Amino acid sequence: MVSGSDSRSEPSQLSDRDLVESVLRDLSEAADKWEALVTQAETVTYSVDLGDVRAVANSDGRLLELTLHPGVMTGYAHGELADRVNLAITALRDEVEAENRARYGGRLQ
């Protein structure tokens, strides 16, 4: 006796379909959770205010804002201004590294 092209029974097919749909639902829910975490991380910013230089960066390391006090442009020589801006950026990096250590227990790579 020759069986049909599909040797599985109907209940087995429904059970397989239910399993696949369940896995797809779980994957979709997990993807939604990750998307929410990424969206939340994109809103995290770090800032430092040295009085004459203020800098803001996001969690990706992009400098979002750099504000200089009006007197900075005439009060500092080129090298001094570069040092102040670098100091602000270093302070931002230190803040991010401290949060990373507190949150994940390791250094930034």
From Swiss-Prot:
One Pfam family cited in the UniProt record for this chain: DUF2710
InterPro entries: DUF2710
Highest taxon in the source lineage: Bacteria
This protein's name: Uncharacterized protein Mb0031
Organism this protein belongs to: Mycobacterium bovis (strain ATCC BAA-935 / AF2122/97)
